[in-house]
Amino acid sequence: MTFIFQLALFALVALSFLLVVGVPVAFAAPEGWNVTKGYVFQGVSAWFALVFTVGVLNSLVA
């Protein structure tokens, strides 16, 4: 169970880093927002899901 928690936490940190870099790039590109809007929303949705998953796994591990 600890390994699954660590894997989910790593995925959360990696996705957070990708969103911190990717969202400003999507906003800065001239037509990038219209093209990448779906990817940004999918990334944010996955981020919220990972936050709740890590929270649940943390309560099970601790």
Swiss-Prot record:
The chain crosses the membrane at residues 8-28, 41-61. GO terms for biological process: photosynthesis; photosystem II stabilization. It is a multi-pass membrane protein. GO terms for cellular component: chloroplast thylakoid membrane; photosystem II reaction center. It comes from the Eukaryota. Keywords: Chloroplast, Membrane, Photosynthesis, Photosystem II, Plastid, Reaction center, Thylakoid, Transmembrane, Transmembrane helix. Pfam families: Ycf9. It is found in: Plastid, Chloroplast thylakoid membrane. HAMAP family: PSII_PsbZ. PSII is composed of 1 copy each of membrane proteins PsbA, PsbB, PsbC, PsbD, PsbE, PsbF, PsbH, PsbI, PsbJ, PsbK, PsbL, PsbM, PsbT, PsbY, PsbZ, Psb30/Ycf12, at least 3 peripheral proteins of the oxygen-evolving complex and a large number of cofactors. It forms dimeric complexes. Belongs to the PsbZ family. May control the interaction of photosystem II (PSII) cores with the light-harvesting antenna, regulates electron flow through the 2 photosystem reaction centers. PSII is a light-driven water plastoquinone oxidoreductase, using light energy to abstract electrons from H(2)O, generating a proton gradient subsequently used for ATP formation. This is Photosystem II reaction center protein Z. It comes from Nephroselmis olivacea. The lineage of its organism: Eukaryota, Viridiplantae, Chlorophyta, Nephroselmidophyceae, Nephroselmidales. The gene is psbZ.
